[in-house]
Amino acid sequence: MARRAQRKAERAKVKQWYKVLAPEMFGRTPVGETLANDPNKLLGRVIETTLGDLTNNFSKQNTKLRFKIDAVAGDTAYTKFIGHEMTTDYIRSLVKRRTSRIDAVVDVTTSDGYLVRVKPSCFTVKRARANQVKAIREISRQVIISRAGNIDLNGLIQEVVLGKLSLDIYKDAKAVYPLRRVEIRKTEILAGPGEVPHPAAVPEPTVTAGS
């Protein structure tokens, strides 16, 4: 009875709109509003937007950003970055007949102690041989590991969403086999400084050849 009465009392509370701000690395830009009858219920809520909406640049609509509310002050909810992902339609549009798509999964630790999973994809001009696929995948890994260890989370995410990291991979890997494009298709924050990440199996990197 007490629990039922508590739920009834919570439902009776007046709901309030809270302004949601992007993380500091994205300039605390407003990303929308969310409704709650208790500010504590906002903590942990995940907010999705696109880089296009955040920057008013329509060409960036294929980049989805995920933020998590981690603090509330007054009628404002603050967020932290937890990952990004390119839209499925966009990635599919890059796969052409008789070409290769070379995926990799790279777990890296930034200079400020964040464990980040980075998933690059390289798209070749024509179908690559197995040894070329292996070499390009290894170059992707080494570029990401080398860069991530020398910059903080903010710097890494900026290089991902602005395309600098994918450009660095492209410059090094094109010497192995001509590439049409390189994208960092997804990132995930696995753990913050001092946190223990949840156990997760790392999928095998794959190559997909257009038929």
Curated annotation (Swiss-Prot):
Keywords recorded for this protein, A-Z: Ribonucleoprotein, Ribosomal protein
Molecular-function GO term, any one: structural constituent of ribosome
Biological processes annotated in GO: translation
UniProt entry tagged with the keyword Ribosomal protein: yes
One cellular component (GO) term of this entry: ribosome
A Pfam family it matches: Ribosomal_S3Ae
UniProt similarity note: Belongs to the eukaryotic ribosomal protein eS1 family.
NCBIfam families associated with the record: PRK04057.1
Name under which the protein is recorded: Small ribosomal subunit protein eS1
Source organism of the structure: Methanothrix thermoacetophila (strain DSM 6194 / JCM 14653 / NBRC 101360 / PT)
